[in-house]
Amino acid sequence: MWPQPYLPPHPMMLEESRQNKLAAAKKKLKEYQQRKSPGIPAGAKTKKKKTDSSPETTTSGGGHSPGDSQYQELAVALESSSVTISQLNENIESLKQQKKQVEHQLEEAKKTNNEIHKAQMERLETINILTLEKADLKTTLYHTKRAARHFEEESKDLAGRLQYSLQRIQELERALCAVSTQQQEEDRSSSCREAVLHRRLQQTIKERALLNAHVTQVTESLKQVQLERDEYAKHIKGERARWQERMWKMSVEARTLKEEKKRDIHRIQELERSLSELKNQMAKPPSLAPPAVTSVVEQLQDEAKHLRQEVEGLEGKLQSQVENNQALSLLSKEQKQRLQEQEEMLREQEVQRVREQERLCEQNERLREQQKTLQEQGERLRKQEQRLRKQEERLRKEEERLQKQEKRLWDQEERLWKKEERLQKQEERLALSQNHKLDKQLAEPQCSFEDLNNEKKSALQLEQQVKELQEKLDEEHLEAASQQNQQLETQLSLVALPGEGDGGQHLDSEEEEAPRPTPNIPEDLESREATSSFMDLPKEKADGTEQVERRELGFVQPSGVTDGMRESFTVYESQGAVPNTRHQEMEDVIRLAQKEEEMKVKLLELQELVLPLVGNHEGHGKFLIAAQNPADEPTPGAPAPQELGAAGEQDDFYEVSLDNNVEPAPGAAREGSPHDNPTVQQIVQLSPVMQDT
């Protein structure tokens, strides 16, 4: 929390102390008048002759006694004092109202300071949220880099395993390298990555279509080969059936030939037996009919020859048939071997086709897996791009909100500057009017008007001091808000897209103070200590104003150029150092206010020392002479009371009026001039000097 500014004492306490001091001054004045009244009837006449040359003051020719004239003067003085007391009460009431207004303004200033402090706490919370979001962004960037490295490793593995798709894998590596190296340019690289992935997907789809076409072509060729194989097998089966039928026929013919051969051999054997019988019969003596026998023998021999010829023919046929059978068996063996070889070739072709089909299926599986991995990578990249876009949108919204807030602060600052200018113009007009009134009132001899003007001056100066403190606090808060906005903009420029410039500039809240005229030093001060204190106090006031200006410059000047690459804890330390410096500056301001209060206490003590001077008879003549000089013929070196009043009104520090606690002289209302009473002359002469101190 901000330290509360040191407030002056309560106005009711000041009023009570003033009333008490006023009553004590009245008592002392009455006692002084009672002591001086019985023994100075003639002295009063001489003093009246010295101070004024009016015919009313001479009592030599009058019919009244000196005691009666003194009593009349006391009555007139009491009446004038009652009138001035009533006027002072009215002035006190008006000052009370003004003080209440000032207190109300102070409460409003406190409320505005609390609101500004709440706004600063909200800004600190937003800074914390932004730092947390920055840490989340760093973690996401780290994970994306790790994912990119993982993708590179996977792409290298795929490049080692998939020689057939080397070119596409190299494109994938380039795409992954582009993802890892160009993450700060998501808007441009996202479209490029999508185009590359789309192109690669199109390429894989085309290759898959080509492979599917190749597979269909191979399957069609395989089906055609299978059909050819089936036709060839049918043809071989038909030829085999024909050869088997032919072999069966040849075997049947061979069997019939063997049977015929057996029959022929059996007939030949029978003929040989019959021939042997005939030979035996021929060897016997011829019978009675030899011609018949010879004819029979000849016939049998002819038949035997014929049978031998037939047997030889059958043997040749059988031999040729055997040779044909051997040739057919060789042909059948050769055909069987050729068929076996063709079947082996067909089996090998089938195995090769099956292997090729398996290889194509494996390649299709690898392509499907690769396409699946590419789709997964594309999905991950899309999700990552969506997250980054959401984060960018959130950062843009936060930046827009900060810009709007900064714009509101600028508008508020402009309104404050305009309000301050209006207040300065009003203060200048009030100062001119007050100076004009003071000139008129100083021309008049009544002390009540001087008291009223001094009270108004003190109230105006109090209001001016409160306004200055309020303006300083507003400038502090605005400067701190501007510095925090600049730090936020530097952090956002590091996180957001490159190319954005720094958002804010330092607020220049230095006030150009109006030149303050130094009060004129009166030459009629006889005490060296009074003159030295009178000369030192303006220097102290100037030193105080210089300190306040240095504090204001310390609030305005930046603590240093913050580095955008610092870690978040250094940012918190730099942000925490600003409130500490503000606390120190506020403590210095409070210390200055305490010093001013001590000066006011010293002025009150000097006010208490004024009244004992009234009883000093030796200093009475000096103060009387000092009162006559500014009223009748002012010295050229001594300043007029108007100048002193105007100079006291333009000072920035608190001033306490000393004329409110002194009762006016009894003859002031009657005569209309301060020359009739020496007490009035003393207080009138000392009041501007004490106001300057």
From Swiss-Prot:
Keyword Cell membrane part of the UniProt annotation: no
Q: Which residues form a coiled coil?
A: 77-611
Matching InterPro entries, A to Z?
GOLGA_cons_dom (IPR043976), Golgin_A (IPR024858)
Instruction: Please state the span of the N-terminal signal peptide per the UniProt entry.
Output: none
Record GO cellular component, one term: Golgi cisterna membrane
Q: Which Pfam families match?
A: GOLGA2L5
Please give a single GO biological process term from the UniProt record.
Answer: Golgi organization
S-S bonds: none
Domain of life the protein comes from: Eukaryota
Q: Where is the composition biased (Basic and acidic residues)?
A: 537-551
* Stretch list, region Disordered: 1-72, 497-551, 629-650, 660-679
Q: Which UniProt keywords apply?
A: Coiled coil
Name the residue ranges with Pro residues bias: 1-11
The text of the family note is:
Belongs to the GOLGA6 family.
The name of this protein is Golgin subfamily A member 6B
